From Swiss-Prot:
Primary residence: endoplasmic reticulum
Pathway noted in the entry: Alkaloid biosynthesis
Keywords per UniProt: Endoplasmic reticulum, Heme, Iron, Membrane, Metal-binding, Monooxygenase, Oxidoreductase, Transmembrane, Transmembrane helix
Pfam families reported in the protein's UniProt record: p450
Organism name: Eschscholzia californica
Cofactor(s) this protein requires: heme
Membrane-traversing stretches: 11-31
Membrane-topology descriptor: Single-pass membrane protein
Family listed: Belongs to the cytochrome P450 family.
Functional note: Methylenedioxy bridge-forming cytochrome P450 involved in the biosynthesis of isoquinoline alkaloids. Converts (R,S)-cheilanthifoline to (S)-stylopine with a high substrate specificity. Catalyzes an oxidative reaction that does not incorporate oxygen into the product.
Protein name: (S)-stylopine synthase 1
Induction (record text): Up-regulated by methyl jasmonate treatment.
GO terms for biological process, alphabetical: isoquinoline alkaloid biosynthetic process
The encoding gene: CYP719A2
Gene Ontology molecular function: (S)-stylopine synthase activity; heme binding; iron ion binding; monooxygenase activity
Length: 495
């Protein structure tokens, strides 16, 4: 929402359009289809902007978390004067939406601009549930991301990790010990996804570099989509038209990048083979592939970067993690930790869970939409109603997580799922959402994140670039939870 405020202040067209459409917006407000649905209470609205005056100043998920303390864990927020959304910040109601009535709330409500880079909303994350969505999701999970296929990637992931460690060492030597690890992690994940899409023999560094740039460019222009959705007539403004042109340029870049590979004869265990076998249009195939990169690369790499930032800020946690990794590596004669080792490392798993709790990569998930008339808390919900679950709020519930704003992996070391509090912690930790629309790439994401963090924490001691200059933990919301200031760190080789 901070992007919206900046755009409004710097763009007189938006203010002009707001004034000229006041009467039309009021007309739309009072002539909406009548319904017996009663919207949950929420903060008082202003004409045209709804609650947007309350949503700036800090991260949106934090603002909504604080508003929920005043207006209730199920409240209505108006993004502009015509786009109400129910925001859920309570685990019981979140499970009602995400799990117990998963099929009722399984539709999507996406900004129009996203049609351009999703083949008209025909990708897994953008399409409503139905036969197409089910088939596409099963193909990704049962073919490209099958356990057998992921296991076949282990040797390649380990080679990529060895290369990454060497590259980081070289960067540190040339830069007084300081590195910027994020791009290195992104490219390792890009290579992994490329092999799952095209086959194990795929090795094209130019493609990896170009895809990396395409993702970065799309993330850069993504913020405007929320503004256009808030103001109905913003889509007619020059600034919005400029954003559309930029997304269309990104669309062409992706098409030109992926389309030459559609004529390959890929192995049967690849995502490309599955997509072609379903006789999908080339446009659907291209953007189903792009979606795997868009949602997989930054989410995994940024979560690893957040974890490293926490380890720098909490040296005792970093040392405790290193001791576990070093002990295991010594006993098992490891130069690098292997993918199959990851689940045997208890403290590593606790650090991973705590990182995902503190910095969920999609803190507001992707908004759900009721695909039929249903209910919430026993009250009627109309078909088409938008519902957003604030994952951040669930993860920072002080009644579930003691001292919730403190990074404390130990909280996950002795969780008893039979204990009431342990069960509440398990149910409240939803970094990948839950229910039928849970992240399709969850297992791959957890695997790559865990593997990367284990080896980077084992290979190097991570510290501040200068004494007292701690990593900036402020974030900004795009497709995923971005670092406002990308991580820089000083590294020293441990082994």
């Amino acid at each position: 929402m901070e992007e919206m405020k900046i755009l409004m202040m710097n763009n007189p067209w938006i203010l002009t359009a707001t004034a000229t459409t006041l009467l039309i917006s009021i007309f739309l407000f009072f002539t909406r289809k009548s319904s017996k649905m009663v919207w949950p209470a929420g903060p008082k609205t202003l004409p045209i902007i709804g609650n947007m005056h309350l949503l700036g100043g800090t991260a949106l998920q934090v603002v909504l978390h604080n508003l929920a303390k005043v207006h209730g864990s199920v409240m209505t927020i108006w993004i502009g004067s015509w786009r109400p959304v129910i925001v859920v910040s309570d685990i019981e109601r979140a499970w009602e939406v995400l799990v117990n009535k998963s099929s009722d709330y399984s539709a999507r409500d996406m900004p129009d601009i996203t049609k351009i880079i999703s083949a008209d909303w025909k990708t897994i994350s953008t399409s409503d549930s139905g036969p197409h969505w089910t088939n596409l999701r099963k193909g990704l999970q049962n073919v490209a991301l099958s356990p057998h296929n992921l296991a076949a990637q282990f040797q390649f992931q380990e080679k990529d990790m060895t290369k990454m460690i060497q590259t980081l060492e070289e960067e540190a030597r040339n830069n007084n010990g300081i590195v910027k690890p994020l791009d290195h992690m992104k490219k390792a994940t890009l290579r992994l996804i490329s092999r799952l899409v095209f086959g194990q023999d795929f090795n094209n560094d130019k493609y990896v570099d170009d895809m990396h740039l395409a993702i970065e460019e799309l993330i850069r222009v993504s913020g405007y989509a929320r503004l256009a959705e808030a103001f109905y007539y913003a889509k007619y403004l020059p600034s919005h038209k400029k954003a559309v042109r930029e997304v269309e340029e990104a669309q062409r870049r992706v098409q030109n990048l992926v389309s030459p590979f559609l004529s390959l004869n890929p192995p049967t265990n690849t995502y490309l083979h599955f997509l072609r076998s379903q006789k999908y249009d080339d446009e659907v195939i291209i953007f189903a592939i792009f979606e795997a990169y868009l949602l997989g690369v930054d989410s995994t790499s940024l979560t690893t970067a957040w974890a490293l930032a926490f380890l720098i800020r909490e040296p005792n946690v970093q040392e405790k993690l290193y001791q576990e990794l070093e002990s295991f590596a010594s006993k098992n004669d490891r130069r690098i930790l292997k993918v199959e080792d990851i689940n045997k490392l208890q403290y590593l798993q606790a650090v991973i869970k705590e990182t995902m709790r503190m910095k969920p990569i999609a803190p507001l998930a992707i908004p759900h939409k009721a695909c039929r008339d249903t209910s919430l808390m026993g009250k009627k919900i109309d078909k088409g109603t938008r519902v957003m679950v604030n994952i951040f709020a669930l993860h920072h519930n002080k009644n579930v997580f003691n001292d919730p704003f403190k990074f404390m992996p130990e909280r996950f070391m002795k969780v008893d799922s039979q204990d009431a509090n342990g069960k509440a912690m398990e149910q409240s930790l939803l970094p990948f959402s839950a229910g039928m629309r849970i992240c399709a790439g969850m297992e791959l994401g957890k695997l790559q994140f865990s593997f990367a963090l284990a080896n980077l924490a084992y290979a190097f001691k991570w510290s501040c670039v200068a004494d007292g200059v701690l990593p900036d933990m402020s974030d900004q919301l795009g497709f995923v939870l971005l670092m406002k200031t990308p991580l820089e760190a000083r590294i020293n080789r441990r082994n």
